[in-house]
């Protein structure tokens, strides 16, 4: 490739990366959403249904995390997704699976524990990014 073509490719790559970054507005919105999810999820079925939304928020923020935070969260998530059983069978979709079926009491307990720990971890990370803003915006 000639120099001009290489320069254009590099510029496009750089611009694309900058445009797809996780902005402060998105972080604040996700911080408020995690707080709302945790505050309004009272029963087990609601918690289980909202696991997917928490995982979506994590997937959006994961590239912005420090490598040690990301590794810790990935280990945490993969550890739980293997334990959650749907109708007595391990979920095949991993972390992206939406838990729609009725769960046994033991699986429901694992899933709600996962919801609580995941929500608390996400809230902790998001709060560390905006320590003064999270409570004021509510």
From Swiss-Prot:
Role played: A humoral factor that may play a role in stress tolerance.
Induction / repression: By a variety of stressful conditions including bacterial infection, heat shock and exposure to ultraviolet light.
UniProt family annotation: Belongs to the Turandot family.
Keywords associated with the record: Immunity, Innate immunity, Secreted, Signal
GO BP term, example: response to bacterium
One CC-aspect GO term: extracellular space
Protein name stated in the entry: Protein Turandot B
Signal peptide: 1-21
InterPro entries: Turandot
Pfam families in the cross-refs: Turandot (PF07240)
């Amino acid at each position: 490739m000639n120099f001009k073509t290489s320069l254009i490719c590099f510029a496009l790559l750089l611009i694309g990366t900058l445009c797809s970054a996780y902005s402060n507005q998105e972080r604040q919105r996700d911080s408020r959403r995690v707080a709302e999810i945790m505050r309004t999820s009272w029963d087990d079925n609601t918690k289980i249904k909202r696991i997917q939304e928490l995982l979506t928020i994590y997937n959006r923020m994961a590239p912005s995390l420090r490598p040690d935070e990301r590794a810790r969260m990935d280990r945490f998530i993969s550890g739980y997704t293997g334990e959650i059983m749907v109708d007595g069978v391990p979920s095949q979709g991993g972390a992206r699976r939406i838990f729609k079926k009725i769960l046994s009491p033991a699986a429901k307990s694992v899933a709600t524990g996962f919801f609580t720990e995941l929500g608390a971890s996400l809230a902790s990370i998001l709060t560390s990014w905006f320590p003064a803003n999270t409570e004021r915006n509510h």
